[in-house]
Amino acid sequence: MTTLENPEMQAQLLSAALPYMQRYENKHVVVKYGGHAMGNPELGKAFARDIALLKQSGINPIVVHGGGPQIQAMLTKLGIESRFEGGLRVTDEKTVEVVEMVLAGSINKEIVALINAEGEWAIGLCGKDGNMVFAQKAHKTVIDPDSNIEKVLDLGFVGEPAEVDRTLLDLLARSEMIPVIAPVAPGRDGHTYNINADTFAGAIAGALAATRLLFLTDVPGVLDKDKNLIKELSVADAQALIKDGTISGGMIPKVETCIEAIRRGVEGVVILNGKTPHSVLLELFTEHGAGTLIVP
């Protein structure tokens, strides 16, 4: 008999989860949803059920999502060629229209529908709604390999959060609604900007002084040099691991985003594997969690 078929084991699991449910009651938990989980229907359903259970447990979940592969697929379908500078996509006027259509349209509404199918009341938003987020143009620099001189890249309508107003999010929390937010926002200059979903989620979590910010990724978390999962890191520990090369490659910007979220007032940020079914519940409602927790 499996655990799920054993009533006594089910009761024990629920009982063990109770202290964690009480810890997060009435708290804000921001979940950045992306990676492999978004392309897998079963994982998508499991994620939606996790978010519904958080709400039913008295927690205020906020979902921020990405959608890079879906954006690229739509650009290809429409015959819009992508241009890159220093390995980064340039978002011109045509591209940002597609970005908004895909992120704030199809992907956003798919996630909303999945959560609503679990009996909750989710609402799809982007940074434009309720003047929630205003963006500013992002400035990226790279070192020219030939001249070794720092070069400023113009990536078009790629932005970063400049202002976050939590008024609408507080209203939705009081109304028992679950915000699902696409990382698209207006600038004070009147343009629409595409914002990195991790950065966007960190800004939202900081504005809410969230108890937890969860980044669902395609990896278990931060690994040590022996490829073992590190369960918890302070900001100082994380910075030291970047410096000595333990944290490298694509994990560096992810961890730096976590550190910035902590500086903005988030109590703890977790990098965890979104390919593990119900990883959100495992992280929040079990003793050992499911990823790497970064704390001040």
From Swiss-Prot:
Source taxon at top rank: Bacteria
Gene3D superfamilies: Acetylglutamate kinase-like
Function of the protein: Catalyzes the ATP-dependent phosphorylation of N-acetyl-L-glutamate.
Site, as annotated: Transition state stabilizer: 32, 254
Listed name of the protein: Acetylglutamate kinase
Recorded metabolic or biological pathway in which this protein acts: Amino-acid biosynthesis; L-arginine biosynthesis; N(2)-acetyl-L-ornithine from L-glutamate: step 2/4
GO MF entry, a single one: acetylglutamate kinase activity
Residues that coordinate or bind substrate: 67-68, 89, 194
Substrates-to-products reaction catalysed: N-acetyl-L-glutamate + ATP = N-acetyl-L-glutamyl 5-phosphate + ADP
EC number(s) recorded for this UniProt protein: 2.7.2.8
Annotated gene: argB
Family matches, as InterPro entries: AceGlu_kinase-like_sf (IPR036393), AcgluKinase_fam (IPR004662), ArgB (IPR037528), Asp/Glu/Uridylate_kinase (IPR001048), NAGK-C (IPR041727)
Keywords: Amino-acid biosynthesis, Arginine biosynthesis, ATP-binding, Cytoplasm, Kinase, Nucleotide-binding, Transferase
GO cellular component, one term: cytoplasm
